[in-house]
């Protein structure tokens, strides 16, 4: 919906529904090639005996997880891992409002390996998967040697199945689950509150040709600052305004998830733009409450109205302040 903030003179775009996953193709593509080359170098000759090959945990939890995994930092070394971590942290701060990531795993899937549906909320508000799987098919896609291996995420509307039930609709897997192919260099960030997993891999038993991914969680949402304004410059303005805003938000109907607002601040200190960088805000449905769309509008418009009215100290250049708001 498009809500007009009359006081600030801005139009604030508020989506009707949250966005629980996002796909970024070509994420650190050159560096991803470097990481893949390290892996290929160590697996090229299966007859070679080398300590670097003896690093995998065969993780099997009956009826839940079956895969090969290893800590990415141990596998790639501190320098390469540091570059990977830097790229992920930069993306996490800018787009997801998160200041840290968990230690990254690297996992390999060959024939019969999979992850059944699960939800792992405590680790962080966003999970991620970065694919190093080869695009080795004739058409340039992945999967010349196997089928399956997609990230699968349950569509949020199916969690309220009867509310959205349509007796005239045929419901098949694509209406229940979102499946995302492990294309090389593809970063998938998603809301781990939704049941998710990895579809079973069929085909190759050769780890050189299996599903290879890096994965972990973005965590620790907190404000970030870039440009002329520092945290110390902006904190006095933010502390007063956010205290009042939080007091109003607790009076609104309950919701779960997070939204993150990126503010563009002009050199004179005025806020000139607000962009929602991520949004998983999901109202808690109760019969006596307004519609979920109305609740989302109320919460996000309240946030936007408060932020667009802010006036920061003047500086000699533009700034961007990214503010996450978490609801439980």
Label for each model-derived stretch:
Residues 2-92, 231-240, 244, 256, ...:
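Non-heme Fe(II)/2-oxoglutarate
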Residues 9-11, 114-119, 176-177, 201-203:
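Catalytic micro-motifs at enzyme active sites that drive phosphoryl/nucleotidyl and oxygen chemistry
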Residues 20, 102, 113, 124-128, ...:
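Residues that flank catalytic or metal-binding motifs in active/ligand-binding sites
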Residues 28-30, 111-113, 122, 133-137, ...:
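Short, solvent-exposed loop/turn segments at secondary-structure junctions
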Residues 57-113, 117-123, 132-141, 299:
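Signature of the catalytic double-stranded beta-helix
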Residues 127-132, 326:
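A contiguous pocket-lining binding segment that forms or flanks enzyme active sites
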Residues 135-183, 200:
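A short beta-strand-loop-beta hairpin characteristic of the jelly-roll/cupin
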Residues 168-177, 184-328:
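Charge-biased low-complexity segments
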């Amino acid at each position: 919906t498009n809500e007009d903030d009359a006081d600030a003179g801005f139009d604030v775009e508020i989506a009707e529904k949250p966005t629980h996953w996002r796909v970024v193709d070509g994420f650190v593509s050159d560096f991803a090639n470097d990481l893949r080359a390290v892996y290929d170098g160590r697996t090229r000759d299966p007859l070679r005996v080398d300590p670097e090959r003896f690093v995998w945990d065969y993780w099997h939890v009956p009826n839940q997880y079956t895969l090969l995994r290893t800590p990415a930092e141990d596998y790639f070394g501190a320098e390469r891992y540091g570059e990977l971590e830097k790229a992920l942290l930069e993306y996490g701060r800018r787009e997801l409002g998160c200041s840290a990531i968990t230690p990254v795993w690297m996992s390999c899937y060959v024939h019969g390996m999979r992850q059944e549906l699960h939800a792992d909320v405590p680790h962080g508000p966003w999970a991620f998967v970065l694919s190093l799987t080869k695009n080795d098919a004739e058409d340039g896609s992945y999967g010349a040697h196997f089928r399956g291996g997609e990230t699968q995420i349950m569509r949020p509307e199916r969690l309220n199945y009867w509310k959205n039930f349509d007796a005239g609709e045929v419901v098949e897997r694509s209406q229940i689950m979102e499946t995302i192919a492990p294309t090389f260099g593809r970063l998938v960030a998603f809301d781990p509150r939704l049941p998710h997993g990895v579809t079973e891999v069929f085909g190759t038993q050769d780890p050189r040709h299996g599903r290879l991914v890096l994965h972990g969680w973005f965590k620790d949402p907190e404000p970030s600052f870039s440009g002329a304004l520092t945290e110390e410059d902006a904190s006095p303005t933010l502390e007063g305004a956010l205290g009042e805003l939080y007091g109003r938000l607790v009076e609104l109907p309950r919701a779960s998830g997070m939204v993150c607002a990126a503010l563009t601040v002009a050199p004179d200190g005025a806020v000139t733009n607000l962009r929602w960088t991520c949004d998983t805000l999901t109202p808690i449905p109760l019969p006596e409450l307004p519609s979920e769309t109305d609740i989302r509008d109320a919460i996000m418009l309240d946030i936007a109205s408060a932020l667009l009215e802010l006036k920061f100290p003047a500086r000699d250049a533009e700034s961007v302040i990214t503010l996450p708001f978490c609801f439980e």
